[in-house]
A protein has these predicted regions:
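Feature captures the RNA virus RNA-dependent RNA polymerase
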Residues: 1-311
Length: 311
């Protein structure tokens, strides 16, 4: 479906209701909320209604794992919310309840929206204020940041079947495989494919620094293990994860200094594959159903006697 979204002229998104049977508000028999108005003398005051970004983020559609690639990969999106219609492409966004001439929204050559207007909602997150997925103009590090930011956002979504954890993201992972600084992944943990294996290993080690955002001791909200997927990957857990991404330093350096001496994987046959072998033969890991599930790290050991605490 990733190729379908990327090449479609327009994606119609139903961000209203709780299931696929709800329909599109304002179309046929599906009602939508009326725009409130008041007249004071000869002045008519209209409600601008709830901002569509808020409506989209709080919709059932935004909680579903399979719709993430629809949001991220589509070139043009026409979104139906409970109140109004919202449009967003990779250059601008506008919505029905506020009428602004398009000439005033755009820069002089009409190539993009003026920077003073609010950025779009798709692809935008706490680490990337403007979510345009123009990956070919980015450095190898910035592509890595965008990849991990996408993982963070996707991990907060829900899936009916645990084994869909990576399948529902396959359109996005293939997008990152085709850019100038190409990235592959092992169980959802990315590394650059266009560099020597030692540097690729450093990036992979940084991918391993993900953490749960929910308290593991909270009996209700704690992360849940996904059967059949490795525990060392975010894909092996249901629940939002976070990565310590540095996006505002202006320095394209990895934030985690890798002291790992070696990274390898153990297959079901007990055969050991070095990380360099995985990089040299990417077909080994692209079919994740048969990928090695055991991760082996060789690292320096810090003895417990090196730590002290105030009792």
């Amino acid at each position: 479906m990733g190729f379908v979204y990327e090449n479609a002229e327009l994606s119609i998104i139903a961000a209203a209701g709780q299931d696929e049977n709800y329909g599109l508000p304002g179309v046929d028999a599906t009602p939508r909320k009326a725009q409130l108005a008041a007249e004071i003398g000869n002045v008519r005051v209209l409600s601008s209604m709830r901002h569509p970004h808020s409506s989209i983020r709080s919709s059932k559609w935004s909680t579903r794992g399979w719709t993430f690639q629809e949001a991220m990969l589509s070139r043009r999106r026409l979104v139906f919310t409970e109140e109004q219609v919202y449009f967003e492409c990779n250059a601008m966004n506008c919505y029905e309840s506020v009428s602004i001439p398009l000439d005033k929204l755009h820069v002089k050559n009409k190539s993009k929206q003026r920077g003073c207007f609010r950025a779009g909602v798709f692809g935008r997150n706490g680490k990337e204020a403007f979510g345009r997925l123009d990956l070919n103009t980015l450095t190898i590090y910035r592509v890595f940041v965008r990849y991990l930011a996408a993982i963070e956002e996707y991990s907060a979504r829900e899936l009916r079947y645990d084994m869909d954890s990576l399948d529902a993201l396959i359109g996005v992972t293939r997008k990152f495989e085709r850019v100038r600084h190409s990235y592959l992944h092992i169980w959802g943990l990315p590394y650059p494919s266009s560099v020597e294996s030692g540097k690729a290993r450093d990036y992979f080690a940084n991918s391993l620094t993900w953490v749960h955002t929910q308290d593991c001791w909270d009996s209700i909200a704690k992360p849940r293990r996904r059967a059949g997927l490795p525990s060392w990957s975010w894909s092996g857990w249901a629940g939002k994860v976070s990565l310590p991404l540095h996006t505002d330093s202006g320095d394209d350096k990895l934030w985690f200094h890798n002291e790992t001496a070696a990274i390898s994987f153990e297959c079901e046959s007990e055969k050991i594959l070095e990380f360099a072998q995985m990089v040299q033969h990417p077909s080994i890991e692209t079919a994740h159903s048969s990928s090695p599930r055991v991760l082996i790290l060789q690292t320096p050991v810090v003895p417990s006697s090196a730590f002290s605490y105030d009792s």
